[in-house]
Amino acid sequence: MEHFDLAAFYGGSATELYRTLGAHRTPDGWVFRVWAPHAGSVSVVGDFCAWDPTAHPMRRLDGGIWETEVAGLSEYDTYKFAVTAQSGAVTFKADPYAFHAETRPGTASKLYELAGYDWGDGAYLAAKQPVYDRPLNIYEVHLGSWRRRENGDFYDYRSLADELSEYAADLGYNCVELMPVTEYPLDDSWGYQCTGYFAPTSRYGTPHDFMYFVDMMHRRGISVILDWVPAHFCKDEHGLIDFDGEPCYEYADPKKREHAGWGTRVFDYGRGEVKSFLLSSAAYWLREYHLDGLRVDAVASMLYLDYGREAGEWTPNKNGGHENLEAIDFLRALNTAAFAVDPNVMMVAEESTAWPLVTYPVSDGGLGFNLKWNMGWMNDMCHYLKLDPWFRQFHHKDLTFSLMYAFSENFVLPISHDEVVYMKGSLRGKMPGDEWRQLAGVRSFMVYMLTHPGKKLTFMGAELGQWHEWDFAGQLDWYLLENDANRRMQDFFRAVNRYYLTNPALWRIDFDWAGFEWLVADDNEDNTVVFVRRDGAGEELLVAVNFSPNGYRDYRFGVPQRKTWREELSTDDTAFGGTGEWRNEKPVRTQAIPSHGREQSIAITIPPLGAVILRGAGEYKKPKAKKSKAREELPA
């Protein structure tokens, strides 16, 4: 404990507790330290002592920390802490700071030396830039169900690293977001009910194996974001619950302690030792595993005292409000600590309400995140896509309302795992109609998503044209790639993702009106929207998306500048499963025909249930009137 800052631990500002607490090798053995302030006694138990609580008692130090050293142990030996409560009850607890753990159904911690991995991502780390004005196309992955062995076994971290990094890079994703890999006991929780906040789940291998996973992603230029869950923890006896016989990590107040809807406990954000535990966990993943960001789960449940609670089940804060002031302070401290570790980190909030200033700096009164999932856009789009195209005209605002607030925060547009489970249908399954209409609907939607302001996230499997919902206990329907239509869908994803990555107009100005302009926002009868994306350096892309099964050969609208427009991408391309009959094969020239309140306009072809992207080139002088032409083309 020579370098341990007890004041920082108590005060809730420590970010490196994992270097002291937990189990660490010494010249003479392994030293164990655990925080159990209410315990009557604590000992270390394991296979090495036949789990005898009397074999290796620990001595109590300042701050409720217990310590002992045991000789003759080896890496991977299993252990727990035998914690005796004031009542005399003894519970065997996993180490909250363990680096490694048994694979379920085992619940013991394992000795592990974290040092020694030889990283090869130095060039990637040196080239990192802030996320704001660069492309971010995220492939969300559940490692256990992306792909399985023929016998149903999981792939390990190293095999996943090799295959997934190649696959994601080939498909045009430059980031993967992992559903939680912090150790968890129940597969059905998908990782969102954790027990090990410092241990990558042993389902897929060791800590060094997970380091290899991140390393290989980085070597292929792919960032890695981890879902991280500070909102609640599971109630398994070997975990954090009532750690020393009384609430330690959770609130003692019964009106704050339980999250009844999830059957979990809520962290005590007002207790310094708990804040330090969580801050150290976040910093640990960023620092020791070179992760590029954390997506913080269920932020709304942290911010509101009445979240999931009825009247009488919660107590107002000192100001009489329903905000959890301690959680607000914690989130600000979390983001401050994360940016201290990595100034280019991505701190992403899953916040489902209209809480203000989520992605504003702490110094400006914000929570300090730099990205936030746009749940409103996601809900509107999922509702819209399920509608029969004839009814979509009555819900056109679902397409356009997001631009009323698109620049109020730094948004990520998510089509996440939550939208393809619990009878919600896969992305393709949300679309009405036959196979052709469903796949065409996916293509048009993906163009809309990738060209709409904001960073992007798509859950695995959409690129296969998968019909079935996600099944965490299986794998993606890879067999679909035996079908021509599904291969073409995957080819489309590859092409449109790569197009996004290589065109700055689609990402350089994602959080300001300077990067976006509506050309047609109110054509509800045709289920069509048209807009321009700009990069601020003269490049313009015109995007037209048609959510109707009717194609348009001469769709006219006003344009702000006199340019020639050339089609660069069409969802009707035969390579993607389209018909090839609805293309803008020739350059489209601006004409001196007023439309939509503008002096000049163009007329283009838009495929049924399709989308086109055209690039503008050249700005022209106003032409002289020519009486011989009713529709005068501006010179090229």
Regions found by a protein language model. Name each.
Residues 168, 214, 286, 335-339, ...:
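N-terminal cationic-hydrophobic initiation segments that often serve targeting/anchoring roles
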Residues 104-105, 290-292, 307-475, 480, ...:
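Conserved alpha/beta catalytic core and glycan-binding cleft of carbohydrate-active enzymes
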Residues 1-136, 144, 157-172, 436-439, ...:
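Carbohydrate-interacting/catalytic domains
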Residues 36, 62, 72, 142-147, ...:
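Short, flexible loop/turn elements at secondary-structure junctions
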Residues 124-133, 142-323, 587, 604:
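Substrate-binding/active-site clefts of carbohydrate-active enzymes
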Residues 46, 70, 83, 179-182, ...:
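Glycine-rich, histidine-containing beta strand-loop boundary motifs that form or position
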Residues 59, 187-191, 235-242, 359-360, ...:
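Short glycine-biased active-site loop of nucleotidyltransferases that positions the nucleotide triphosphate
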